[in-house]
């Protein structure tokens, strides 16, 4: 246990700061917010790899923890006696030691390294950036231990992964810089393009994916605005609800259907499938009603996460020399708090990084708050 700020303990220096030993922790992201250790293993990720669920430490709170937490005092952990924190830590240790011993061989696996280092470090960096609001600086908290591997993002009663455009909450998110701007990028037809990568299908570059598929849905050379909108709905339904017979002869969906059943065959034969980039083994231990379509949906959401983390790491490398901050990532979009003099460079360079040599085109939006961002031509 490493006390950070508690009246009952005085610590002048911390052991392990020389990074000479491997550190196991229930929450690597939280630890990195306080001390930037190297050689940190996240036990939550180890558990997620073998059980596909999250560790729950709520039941390990002592009576003292429950007393202070229920009253919602500011800085409540400073009020809990240090011996009670130690008691809770002992309970946590007892609960995770078996996981640590069971997964010793997994620690060196490249797929584990991808999530333990690239994914968690990247999400920790986003969290550290903070989200400036009219009420002061707020912070997000990404949960990677979901059944699909796609992070959720909520903290302090706010679901940052699903902020409404109607209730005014987005208006509160503004730049921390004087005359600063919010800048957002989102991918065009992201899942369709990710799937095309998986099945080696090339969409034409001179037409939108939704228009390209819509022409085949409706058998027309030119779509109305209404048909273009319906094209998006049809694609979504076919991808996540199953491919109807009337669309099976469309080349893209014919290949998608073949890929889905290849995934299913691999799962039935091996007992798992491997994620597209990191090669993480997905066993679906705790997934009810597993079927070919559900496996495909899980595969795509995890592929999305892996791809997003790779480009996000590159974005942080670029921003390391600038004042602009990467403050939020939500499935197919990325939000930045931009220092105005850096806007031209940031807009150009981050667009290049996200698009990956035009494989995944993005749209760009800017405004004075997250609520009033408008599409811009780039």
Question: What are the roles of these predicted feature ranges?
Answer:
Residues 20-33, 186, 245, 328, ...:
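Short glycine-rich phosphate-binding loop at a beta-alpha junction
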Residues 114-118, 126, 130-133:
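Non-catalytic, peripheral interaction segments enriched in hydrophobic/basic residues
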């Amino acid at each position: 246990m490493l006390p950070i700020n508690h009246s009952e303990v005085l610590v002048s220096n911390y052991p392990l700061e020389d990074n000479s030993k491997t550190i196991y922790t229930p929450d690597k992201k939280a630890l990195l917010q306080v001390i930037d250790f190297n050689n940190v293993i996240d036990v939550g990720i180890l558990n997620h790899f073998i059980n596909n669920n999250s560790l729950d430490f709520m039941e390990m709170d002592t009576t003292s923890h429950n007393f202070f937490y229920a009253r919602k005092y500011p800085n409540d952990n400073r009020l809990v006696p240090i011996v009670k924190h130690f008691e809770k830590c002992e309970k946590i240790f007892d609960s995770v030691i078996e996981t640590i011993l069971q997964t010793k061989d997994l620690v060196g696996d490249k797929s584990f390294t991808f999530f333990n280092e690239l994914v968690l470090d990247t999400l920790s960096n986003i969290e550290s950036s903070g989200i400036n609001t009219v009420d002061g600086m707020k912070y997000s908290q990404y949960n990677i231990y979901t059944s699909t591997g796609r992070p959720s993002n909520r903290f302090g009663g706010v679901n940052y992964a699903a902020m409404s455009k109607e209730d005014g909450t987005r208006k509160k998110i503004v730049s921390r810089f004087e005359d600063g701007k919010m800048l957002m990028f989102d991918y065009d037809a992201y899942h369709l393009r990710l799937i095309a990568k998986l099945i080696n299908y090339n969409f034409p570059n001179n037409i939108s994916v939704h228009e390209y598929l819509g022409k085949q849905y409706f058998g027309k050379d030119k779509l109305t605005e209404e048909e273009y909108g319906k094209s998006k709905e049809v694609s979504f339904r076919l991808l996540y609800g199953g491919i109807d017979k009337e669309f099976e002869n469309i080349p893209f969906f014919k290949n998608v259907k073949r890929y889905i059943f290849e995934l299913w065959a691999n799962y039935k034969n091996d007992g798992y499938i491997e994620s597209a980039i990191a090669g993480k083994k997905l066993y679906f231990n705790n997934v009810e009603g597993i079927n070919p379509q559900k496996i495909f949906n899980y595969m795509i959401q995890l592929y999305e996460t892996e791809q997003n983390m790779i480009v996000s790491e590159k974005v942080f490398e670029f921003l390391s020399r600038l004042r602009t901050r990467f403050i939020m990532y939500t499935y197919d979009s990325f939000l930045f708090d931009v220092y105005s003099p850096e806007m031209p460079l940031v807009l150009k360079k981050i667009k290049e990084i996200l698009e990956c040599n035009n494989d995944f085109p993005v749209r760009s939006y800017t405004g004075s708050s997250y609520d009033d961002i408008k599409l811009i031509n780039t």
